[in-house]
């Protein structure tokens, strides 16, 4: 896929995610693999519902901008580490929904477990509701290199992992294609909303 096509996918993802309320204002960041050694990412500080072609830039997998004058998101390393350690990943999405933010703050454990939901089959590799989808939760950290170092061991030991939460911050998920990552965002958001409603009903 060409750079122009990948950029358009990122722009369209931004409009969709903003429209669903999962990427308010200038929050969130999105990316797509450009080559084996490069990625396209959203430029820092841009409104995700109003992205244009100039709001996307190329970086290397160390997170360095390859386009003078354009600054990538501060969280670029969390994208590029996925492209580095998982060759099959073609797109990464990071969102800041209310459900993801609140649920990650309410959960004192370092992970969430979802089971017996039919929608679990929306995740790549999951073929039955009779399984578990485990979502790790990492404490927020302004030092992104340090945060990435905490995430890496989980990625290394859990190849089935489809996404993770940063406490009080948001969700990261990914897929072979942008459409896969978007599908998983929707599935995660459904599960997060179900979990919050279950907790409210059960007063826990």
Curated annotation (Swiss-Prot):
Annotated EC: 4.2.1.109
Presence of keyword Zinc: yes
Gene Ontology cellular component annotations, sorted alphabetically: cytoplasm
Catalytic activities: 5-(methylsulfanyl)-D-ribulose 1-phosphate = 5-methylsulfanyl-2,3-dioxopentyl phosphate + H2O
Entry keywords, A to Z: Amino-acid biosynthesis, Lyase, Metal-binding, Methionine biosynthesis, Zinc
Pathway given in the UniProt record: Amino-acid biosynthesis; L-methionine biosynthesis via salvage pathway; L-methionine from S-methyl-5-thio-alpha-D-ribose 1-phosphate: step 2/6
Gene Ontology biological-process annotations: L-methionine salvage from methylthioadenosine; monosaccharide metabolic process
Cofactor(s) in the UniProt record: Zn(2+)
Pfam families the UniProt entry points to: Aldolase_II (PF00596)
GO molecular function: methylthioribulose 1-phosphate dehydratase activity; zinc ion binding
Binding site for Zn(2+): 94, 96
InterPro entries in the cross-refs: Aldolase_II/adducin_N (IPR001303), Aldolase_II/adducin_N_sf (IPR036409), MethylthioRu-1-P_deHdtase_MtnB (IPR017714)
Top EC category: lyase
Similarity annotation: Belongs to the aldolase class II family. MtnB subfamily.
Function: Catalyzes the dehydration of methylthioribulose-1-phosphate (MTRu-1-P) into 2,3-diketo-5-methylthiopentyl-1-phosphate (DK-MTP-1-P).
Protein name: Methylthioribulose-1-phosphate dehydratase
Organism taxonomic ancestry: Bacteria, Pseudomonadati, Pseudomonadota, Gammaproteobacteria, Pseudomonadales
Gene from which this protein is expressed: mtnB
């Amino acid at each position: 896929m060409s750079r122009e096509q990948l950029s358009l996918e990122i722009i369209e993802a931004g409009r969709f995610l903003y429209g669903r309320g999962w990427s308010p204002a200038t929050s969130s960041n999105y990316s797509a693999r450009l080559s084996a050694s490069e990625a396209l990412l959203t430029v820092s500080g841009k409104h995700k519902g109003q992205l244009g072609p100039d709001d996307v830039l190329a970086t290397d997998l160390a997170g360095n901008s390859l386009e003078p004058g354009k600054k990538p998101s501060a969280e670029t390393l969390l994208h590029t580490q996925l492209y580095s350690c998982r060759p099959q990943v073609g797109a990464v999405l990071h969102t800041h929904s209310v459900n993801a933010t609140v649920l990650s703050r309410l959960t004192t454990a370092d992970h969430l477990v979802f089971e017996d939901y039919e929608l679990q089959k929306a995740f790549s590799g999951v073929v039955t509701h009779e399984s578990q989808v485990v979502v790790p939760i990492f404490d927020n950290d302004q030092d992104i290199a340090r945060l990435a170092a905490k995430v890496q061991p989980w990625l290394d030991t859990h190849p089935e992992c489809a996404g993770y939460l940063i406490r009080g911050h948001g969700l990261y998920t990914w897929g072979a294609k942008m459409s896969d990552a978007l599908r998983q965002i929707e599935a995660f958001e459904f599960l997060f909303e179900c979990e919050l409603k279950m907790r409210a009903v059960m007063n826990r």
